[in-house]
Amino acid sequence: MSRIYATGKRKTAVAKVWLTKGSGKITVNGMSLDEWLGGHEALKLRVRLPLALTKMSESVDVVATTLGGGYSAQADALKHGISKALCAMDDNLRSVLKPHGLLTRDARVVERKKYGKHKARRSPQFSKR
């Protein structure tokens, strides 16, 4: 196994992911996962979920770069990218990841603002008289 590449997306965030055989190190934007996410334990668990489900957390190294969005969206994009890369590495892992929805791109994005409204749906206050 050389380097396996995949991209993950969520909202406006994009994660480019490379998997290599290794000891389980996760590097994001040149920092370790703990440095990158600081005290956000829930986000760290979310990123590690595909590796934990496939029991690969000790056998592959993850190198990733993320662009756009916030930390939560970037973490979800990273999770999606890792899942896709694991499937590219071994197609048998698809049956483990698919039931958990890790291979599905979350299509929810911000609804656009409409004219005549304050936000996407918030209308100006209505006065009867």
UniProtKB/Swiss-Prot annotation:
One of its GO terms (molecular function) is RNA binding. GO terms for cellular component: cytosolic small ribosomal subunit. Keywords: Ribonucleoprotein, Ribosomal protein. GO terms for biological process: translation. NCBIfam families: PRK00132.1. Belongs to the universal ribosomal protein uS9 family. This is Small ribosomal subunit protein uS9. The lineage of its organism: Bacteria, Pseudomonadati, Campylobacterota, Epsilonproteobacteria, Nautiliales.
